[in-house]
Amino acid sequence: MPVNLYYTQRVRGFQQVSEKYTSESATFLLRRTKQRCPRCGSTDIVATPLRHRSIRGEPLGCCREVRMEFTVHRLYCHNCLARNLEHIPFLSHPKARISKSLERTILEMRHYASVQDIAKHFRLRWHAIKELEKKHLRKRFSRIQTAHIKAIGIDEIHVGNGKAGDQYLTIIRDLESGAVVHVGDGKGVAALDGALKKLKKSKLRVVTMDMANAYYSWIAEHFPKVSIVFDHFHVIKLMNDKLDHVRRRVMAKMDSAQQKQLKGLRFVFLKNNEDLPENAKRILKNMRGDFQDLGDAYMFKEALRCIYVRAKTSYHARIAFHRWCKLAEETEVPELKTMARTIRDKLDGIVSYWTFRHISNAPMEGFNTKIRLLTRQAYGFRDREYFKLKIFQLPEISCERTI
């Protein structure tokens, strides 16, 4: 067997009969050296020619398109009486059209090159490159080790505008290693189907999430001893939503001139007080004097944020939240009363933020940004399974903002 085909294409068990070159291609005609029964290994067999195969191999120098041609035989073994197709050692499966060596090169290039670029470089179909990577990822992430997992984060991300079940993905990640544990279609309890089997053998102690009742009830049902942490980002976001609702409610009672003025101050109310310029602080002070509900909501928003800044332990945080809720319930602002009820209902999960050393869902939010960037770079994913497999791989690859 010629040495060049062994070291460049990893061809074993075949002898080179002839070769043909053009300006950009090379074709090698191969012949099997010795046939053996794939079941018992006997050489007492009858080989019947079945079909002619042409397989793409790795480029050689200026020959960008390399083909290896050979005849596939059907084998009959006199020893074990078995009938089989002969095994081709340099193919990953019997119907493969490219060699194992070329497959490995393509998968290595996918770390820094797009599917389209690789397809153009090797003169292969885009679909063939995608299916090769999809098969590799499916095999790699078919089983995920979860025995070591102690802390996970659960979050959903909006990924499209299709059917109701296709608009969202629910993602579970190991907060210590960053590995993706589960990717489910949609949001809510239905999206967590399959996650229970994966997490059953884990050493789960803590789960971070937003304040959605669906995730909370699912964890409470299947992992009753696990501590739940409601991410502080979502608590502040919920308060900002209440504040914005007060602003819009107040605007509805104004004339058009006042509405225009207050509409432009939306983000002034949502910003932290210390981040506001002096002129914005003066405008805000005047607005709070003119509209009491809006002023009260802003003050309670800042007070809630200060709890996260100043409280040192879960004990102090619990006292501060109880006081905040008591004062909010004494106001005449319905949005503040609703927020107070929510905090009282979720208080154990909220103060767990201090119990577990300020653990949060921030890594999940950052990971969602990487998913959006991945989607934008690919101009969307038509293959849902391929998209989910790429999410499993995402912690291992770097996403750049350039295409």
Question: Where are the model-predicted features located?
Answer:
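Acidic, glycine-enriched active-site microenvironments
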Residues: P94-R104, Q116, E176, H182, ...
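RNase H-like nuclease fold core
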Residues: K134-W218
